[in-house]
Amino acid sequence: MNIVHLTASTFYGGPERQILGLCRALADGDRSTVLSFSEGGRCAAFLAEARRQGFEAAAVEHDTPRVRAAVADVAAELERRRADVLLCNGYKANLLGRLAARRVGVPAVAVSRGWTGENVRVRLYETIDRMHLRWMDRIVCVSEGQARKVRRTGARPERVRVICNAIDVERFGDADPTYRATLLRYFPKPPRRIVGAAGRLSPEKGFDVLVAAAERVVKRDPAVGFVVFGEGACRGRLERQIAKSGLGGSFRLAGFRSDLDRFLPYFDLLTLPSFTEGMPNVVLEAFAAGVAVVSTAVGGAPEVVEDGVSGFLVRAGDAAALADRIGEALASEERLHDMGRQGRRRVERRFTFAAQAREYRRLFAELTSAPVETGKEDLVTAESCEH
């Protein structure tokens, strides 16, 4: 079967890793092609990585506001690749991809990873996306939490599927101790424990709440350091908050790192303070690295983090509760390590790309009436995510 994956990539990040992970898992029986709108040339990093991994990849020449030309470009690619199914990733791919797919008679599937509402422009696009989703042939949601949001848009329930994000646990098999040394060098005085976080520095990620929580934690234990990887519009505001809180030596904004997965095994704890998520990739990555997690109970996070087993869940926006749970997790090294082990076991059982690919193949068969194989491993479905 020929599967085309359409997106609008601006860098090689979490959604792009998910796309290529699925491509690899489908490679034993299906052919995947990756397409991206150019985004001013910023799609180059993703397309280069796709080609490096052995997949055909191409940029869509035209883009908005030249909608007709962009739709014609995508339709031509679908015909040239003899596509059986189009997987659309993101609001631009959903809208333009559906129009192109209709033109050539190919089913279009939206992969709904979540809505951030990070600024006025994005909120407008996401509002259009919510209105438009009901016209897709199927909607894949990366968590049951996201599926609930999608159903509230008026999408027909029978068209909604939950297929969770997945993780390649083997990526975290070879730890490099030099990354721990690099982490320590971010701080003027090396801390005894490092609490890590990662994500775009934008309001919905809740890093201002993490700074407030860190102030409480460091007052109790000055040997704890916090480091956040990522860039974004809120960097200046966060820097001012950190300075005002007296955390200049204890809370570091480390910028974007493409090799974040090499640092993760050397966090003592990962925290996710977000106000909204689809299925947080960084939590899956932390668990794959054997690191415990303290997360807000938003989106798909409660479907991954077992409260009190592999980490802790707190209410979004509650800095005091976040600080208390971080302190509780760090209080016992033995419990901290056990939580990390429990998290790794969970992603090994529930969140593999092989299981994800089988669920997608079931969906493709439903859309095309093609035969599909069944497997004995756990399936990444709504049921498996919740237990």
Model-predicted segments: where are they?
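Conserved acidic donor-binding segment of nucleotide-sugar-dependent glycosyltransferases
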Residues: D307-G308, F312-A319, E328-E334
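Short hydrophobic beta-strand element within catalytic cores of glycosyltransferases
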Residues: A292-S295, V305
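N-terminal strand-loop element at the rim of the active site
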Residues: H5-G13, R17-R68, K149, T153, ...
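A short, well-ordered alpha-helix in the C-terminal region of glycosyltransferases
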Residues: A321, E328, R335-R350, Q356-R362
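A conserved mid-protein helix/loop that constitutes part of the nucleotide-sugar donor-binding site
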Residues: G13-R24, R193, A197-K219, F226, ...
